[in-house]
Amino acid sequence: MAAACECPEPSAPPAGSSAESEVPPAGEEEDEADDESSRSSGSGRESQGPEGGGGAGSLAVSEAEPLSRMDSEDSISSTLMDVDSTVSSGRSTPAMMNGGSANKNLSYSCCWDHCQTPFSCSPDLADHIRSIHVDGQHGGVYVCYWKGCKVYNTPSTSHSWLQRHMLTHSGDKPFKCVVGDCNASFASQGGLARHVPTHFSQQNSSKMANHSKSKEESPSKAGLNRKKKLKIKRKRALARPYDFFDAQTLDAIRHRAICFNLCAQIESLGNGHSVVFHSTVIAKRKEETGKIKLLLHWTPEDILPDVWVNESDRHQQKTKVVHLSKLPKDTALLLDPNIYRNSSKRNTHIGTLKEHLS
């Protein structure tokens, strides 16, 4: 771990001033707790003025991540999403470390190794770090050389991680809240994303409180509303115009049809009402008249009987299309027992009706 940054440009902050900290990766929860406690106590002592003590200024950013975990964009993004700060949060920025808001001529110095370039504002420092020190690294390995950083000289393969990480050193907070008169700004988009819903949750909680008060004041009105809701619920329960034959059901039926064709090894035509049979020659004979006959065998198997045809008719008899109603009933059940299931049930039902009538 490198020594703390001792930049010549920024003045020394009070000992009670809050130090900039970033939520550390997994495995450094104790550092995070220490940073949070020092930040809360420091924000309370800041109002007492510079008499609270002083010391050498240093930028200590608690972000130590091993190479195996820093290389994961998702883990780094989730870690950085916890880094949120507002204008009034008490986190130290280069402006605060150079003497607070009372000094108008603030100086922001780059604490990168072998670089002490001063700047008048934190956005300029952030642009300098991004263009010179971050984008200038090539080769697939990216390292933070900011003096005093807890991940100093720790390699990473994520270029975007290093870009987001350097925002904690520059003090730049480019993500600003646009809700109402809120002046909060954040160093990461994740912090802004978590901050914005807090405005609406406060509004919703106030609305719910007012709504509960109105119910308590007028219980009879609440009872009427409950009855109306029950009536509407009953009406909806009576008729539900939903079509359950959706795309998923159609896919399931199509899948069963494909499985049926594969198991039965058949082809169908006319919306599945006709079966296509294919013939193969299994025997050949020559009659006394000199004509040559061929014995054709039909597939699917055991549905149609083998037949002798003239050799000249072989081309026409390669395939035969037979309607399901024309198939022999004793052998058609070999295709699938469901083919005549409805008709058999219908005949059974008609027979029972006749018995009752007689």
From Swiss-Prot:
Q: Which GO terms describe its biological process?
A: chromatin organization; regulation of transcription by RNA polymerase II
Query: Which molecular function terms from Gene Ontology are attached?
Result: DNA binding; zinc ion binding
- Name a GO CC annotation attached to this entry: ESC/E(Z) complex
Could you name the domain of life of the organism this protein comes from?
Answer: Eukaryota
The UniProt record lists the keyword Cell membrane: no
* UniProtKB keywords: Chromatin regulator, DNA-binding, Metal-binding, Nucleus, Repeat, Repressor, Transcription, Transcription regulation, Zinc, Zinc-finger
**Stretches with biased composition (Low complexity):** 1-26, 39-49
Among PROSITE patterns, the record links this protein to: ZINC_FINGER_C2H2_1 (PS00028), ZINC_FINGER_C2H2_2 (PS50157)
Q: Where is this region: Disordered?
A: 1-94, 199-230
Zinc finger map (C2H2-type)? 108-133, 147-169, 175-199
The residue ranges flagged as biased composition, category Polar residues, are 75-92, 199-211
Q: What does this protein do?
A: DNA-binding transcriptional repressor. May interact with and stimulate the activity of histone methyltransferase complexes.
What's the name of the protein? Zinc finger protein aebp2
